[in-house]
Amino acid sequence: MEKTAAPRTLLPGDWAVLALLAEQPAHGFALAQVLAEDGEVGQVWTMPRPRVYRAIEDLRSAGLIETVETTPSDRGPARTLLAATPAGAVAVEQWLARPVAHVRDARSELLLKLVLTHRAGRDLRPLAAAQHGVLEQLADRLTAQLETADGQRALVLRFRLAQTLAARDYVADLLR
């Protein structure tokens, strides 16, 4: 019987592990290689091997991944092949489609979502369009606030607006 616990809020690294397992079954060691600093996904989101295994245990406890098979190994412990459960696959699809709410998350979480979506061979445009809308609204709010700001507040708002416009332009390029 699979044990489940009330799912805690998943961190981007947990989502990365879940997305990779929704893409195809894998062993923990293979996941750690993809998420290593020089790995395909690690270029965007790096996770040390112990953190990958911790994410695996947390995702398994939440009922989002399961063991597909376990095979003995000549070297070290048995190899456990893992995959996303149906609930895990649905959760990761929803997460991948959801734009980030803050510009500060564009460099990390948004880029991670884009890389994982691309890696899975899916169209980036739905996420890019949703993210463009969020960033456009944020840019409008910051522009309105900047009209009445002065001093230090204006300095900060100009920086935030520049960052927002750069992120907006980046996702707009993905829509072309």
Question: Which stretches of residues belong to each language-model region?
Answer:
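DHp/HisKA dimerization-phosphoacceptor four-helix bundle of two-component histidine kinases
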Residues: 23, 54, 130, 159-166
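Generic structural signal for well-ordered, non-membrane alpha-helices
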Residues: 33, 57, 86, 90, ...
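Amphipathic alpha-helical dimerization/coiled-coil segments
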Residues: 93-140
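Basic helix-turn-helix/winged-helix DNA-binding cores
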Residues: 1-104
